[in-house]
Amino acid sequence: MARAAPPALLLPLLGLAAATAAAAAAAAAVGCPSSTWVQFQDSCYIFLQEAIKVESIEDVRNQCTDHGADMVSIHNEEENTFILETLKKQWKGPDDILLGMFFDTDDASFKWFDKSNMTFDKWSDQEDGEDLVDTCAFLHTKTGEWKKGNCEVSSVEGTLCKAAIPYEKKYLSDNHILISALVIASTVILTVLGAVIWFLYKRNLDSGFTTVFSTAPQSPFNDDCVLVVAEENEYAVQFD
């Protein structure tokens, strides 16, 4: 007698297990585009170490936009320190890094190329009344201070780029621990539930086979009865 197929309930369980595994993979994949980027708070940073010849700061900026980013902007002391330490320890950058900043003559103020608000500065050479037309900013990696310089640079020894983590990715990343815990718990529950259902299914199946054998026709004579009858028949033949 062929055994029946596993109960249909196991198929949805397998589907749920596959879905939770896919959710775990998606949660693990969030963050920066690749391992060459470094994440800090809600942004990803990459230092393009190639030295290039340029005619203007726009050529430098294109290096970043080609990677889906923009030239770096800095908004607090913690971010400035992070960039400084990473340049020293990991990126091995030059003494001066061009920041993504320009002087807007329309309202006589410095602005970031990525259009974020100018909420922080660390100027080392702030002077009143200086001519700031075509002025850009550089981060001095030895001190962490900013200094002004001409935007019409002829070459750069590396470009520091920054990209914001999309809202969806940031939300998933912030809740990665919770998601992982839920995935693990769901997987354990599904595994235990599947094992219980499979055990009950096999037990019921084995009980069915036992019932079939127990209801099969039985001979009215057992082996001992057959042996006694045979001996009596043999004894009767000897006296005939």
Swiss-Prot record:
Predominant location: membrane
Cytoplasmic side of membrane: 198-240
Domain of life: Eukaryota
Entry keyword annotation includes Cytoplasm: yes
Bilayer topology annotation: Single-pass type I membrane protein
Record-annotated disulphide pairs: 136-151
PROSITE patterns: C_TYPE_LECTIN_2
Sequence intervals crossing the membrane: 177-197
Entry keyword set: Cell projection, Cytoplasm, Disulfide bond, Glycoprotein, Lectin, Membrane, Receptor, Signal, Transmembrane, Transmembrane helix
Residues with attached carbohydrate: 117
Compartment list: Membrane; Cell projection, Filopodium; Cytoplasm, Cell cortex
Gene Ontology MF, one: carbohydrate binding
Any one Gene Ontology cellular component term annotated for this protein: cell cortex
Domain C-type lectin residues, every copy: 40-160
Keyword Membrane among UniProt keywords: yes
Gene3D superfamilies, sorted: Mannose-Binding Protein A, subunit A (3.10.100.10)
PANTHER family in alphabetical order: MANNOSE, PHOSPHOLIPASE, LECTIN RECEPTOR RELATED
Role, per record: Potential multifunctional C-type lectin receptor that may play roles in endocytosis and phagocytosis as well as in cell adhesion and migration.
Protein name: CD302 antigen
Organism: Sus scrofa (Pig)
